[in-house]
Design a protein with these regions (language model features):
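Mg2+-dependent phosphoryl-transfer enzymes with acidic/Ser/Thr/Gly-rich catalytic loops
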Residues: 227-228
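Conserved alpha/beta-domain cores
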Residues: 1-205, 211-213
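Paired acidic/hydrophobic, glycine-rich loop segments that form the ligand-binding mouth/hinge
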Residues: 101, 218-219
Length: 228
């Protein structure tokens, strides 16, 4: 994808977000993660050359490692988010390169991240992923366990809970999707503070619903950097 196409898509997303903010009287920023997991290196480089300064989202540990090692040499201040399922044997790559891990879906994984962060002498920012769609194949904590999970993980020395993440059902049913987003927003409202301030919900096809229900971070892939 060329620079002009990327810029046009970015401008369209910003216009949509601003319209939604006006519609719902939202006065806080809504951050965009440019999901690059399906994009070619050429497309990512075109994006970076625009200096738009959005985080890049990767879902596979080796891809994060390889892309970060190559791109960080030539581009300054790239922010990397990890948004995929986490395998304990790949945590070392994720902690080494990710600025924010959005998909922490078990206490065991949080503990692995904490150990690796200690080795790397860093405090790792994370989001807790909740399974708002109740799908077995998706990762995430049960919403009913939010207090126990939050209290246990926040006491780990080298992880920093920045907020929460959820993925909705892929269904043609706005009412169901909105219920899922609102269920996580309710937990976020109870636990948010100056540090725990991110609610990451919504992708290309449903971010308009996520913003309606409190999302302040959205993850856009096919509608932005696309497939290449």
């Amino acid at each position: 994808m060329d620079r002009d196409s990327i810029k046009n898509k970015y401008d369209s997303i910003i216009e949509n977000i601003n319209s939604l903010k006006d519609k719902y009287n939202i006065n806080y920023n809504i951050d965009i993660v440019a999901v690059s997991k399906y994009s070619s290196m050429e497309t990512i480089k075109e994006f970076l050359s625009l200096n738009i300064n959005l985080p890049l989202g990767e879902s596979k540990a080796q891809s994060l490692r390889d892309r970060a090692e190559e791109l960080n040499k030539n581009y300054n201040n790239i922010i990397w988010h990890f948004i995929g399922r986490i395998q304990s044997n790949k945590v070392k790559y994720i902690v080494r390169y990710a600025d924010l891990i959005q998909s922490v879906d078990s206490i065991e994984i949080a503990e692995c991240i904490n150990k690796e962060a200690i080795k790397n002498n860093k405090v790792q920012d994370i989001l807790l992923q909740f399974n708002i769609s109740n799908e077995e194949q998706k990762g995430g904590f049960n919403l009913s366990d939010y207090n126990m999970v939050y209290d246990k993980i926040k006491n780990l020395s080298n992880v920093n809970i920045k907020g929460f993440m959820g993925i909705s059902l892929k269904v043609d049913n706005d009412f169901e999707i909105e219920k899922e987003f609102e269920s996580l927003n309710e937990v976020f409202i109870k636990l948010k503070d100056e540090n725990t301030s991110i609610l990451s919900m919504g992708m290309t096809n449903d971010y308009h619903l996520a913003i309606k229900h409190g999302a302040n971070m959205i993850r856009i892939g096919s509608g932005f950097l696309g497939y290449s």
